Amino acid sequence: MCIRDRECIEQLEEINVIPDIVLCCCGGGGLIAGISTAIKTKFDNAKIYSVEPEYFDDTKISLEKNKIVSNSMKHKSICDALLAEKPGNITFNINKINLTSGVSVSDDEALIAMNTAFKHFKIVLEPGGAVALAAAISEKVKIKNKNILVIASGGNVDKNIFKNCLKTETI
């Protein structure tokens, strides 16, 4: 956790950017716990948001209720890497300190973000890895005139899902 997250800070320092807002995908909460801990040590004023698939926003709801809440698991999502039933105990205790709140995005918003990443940056993202970008594109948080750090991770995407994303709109 420490090496990867320290690299994030070093890259921000290298380009001399102070993030106002950080958007990061969230399943069980491990990635965002590490990222948020690193960000908060250097950029204490940054607002950090977990981004989850619609109907699988257990971290968002858990943060709102200040206790771990489980998803019903009766819905489906293409964001298969993020379909945790509930936040991890250790990661939730870290995230409730570091995170501003959570947001959720639809599968369609994730597909648009995947297409946008591919068309504009030539990056192939899996649906779960595209949710943070989806949150920025769909303005789930106010980002105008802010420095936004979007954590886009994972390129393990089913070829049929990727073909579908290429048929969606893009920004």
Where are these regions (language model features)?
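Glycine-rich phosphate/pyrophosphate-binding loop at beta-loop-alpha junctions
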Residues: R4-I97, I143-K144, I148-I171
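Nucleotide/phosphate-binding catalytic cleft detector across ATP-hydrolyzing
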Residues: M1
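Active-site-adjacent helical/loop segments in soluble small-molecule enzymes
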Residues: R4-R6, G88-N145
